[in-house]
Amino acid sequence: MDKNEIVEHLVEQWIKIAERDLLTAKQGLEADEVITDTVCFHCQQAAEKYLKAFLVKKQIEFTKTHNIMSLLNLCASDDNSFKEELSEADNLTDYAVEIRYPDDWYEPTIEETKLAYESALKVKSFVLKKLEISKE
C-alpha cells in the first residue's frame, strides 16, 4: 500500500468505529430504559472519531485526547468552519471520562442525552460532507 492508500484505509476505519458508536447511542436512546450516561459516552466517542478521521485525511497529527475542542482546533487549522459550525459539540467532552467514574459521576438528563446525540449527528454530517463521503 502506498501512503495515500494507508491514509484512506485509516479514514475508513475511524469512520467505521464512529458509526458503531453512533449506532450504539441511537439504540440506547430508543431503549425502554435509557441509560443516559452510556448514550452520552457513545455520542462523545462517535464525534471524537469522526473528527480524527478528518485529521487523518488531512494528515494533521494529533495526540491521544478525548477533548472535542482540542480536536476542533486542530481541524480548524485546515478549515476554520469547524470551529464556527461545531463549537457547541464541545459539550460532549465531559462525557468521555468524567461521567465514567464514581468520583465524578452524574446521570445526564434525557434532554442532555438528546442534545448529545444531536451534536454527534451534526459532527458526523459536517465531517462526512468535508470528506465528500456519502452515508445515511
Protein language model annotation of sequence segments:
Residues 1-136:
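Terminal alpha-helical segments
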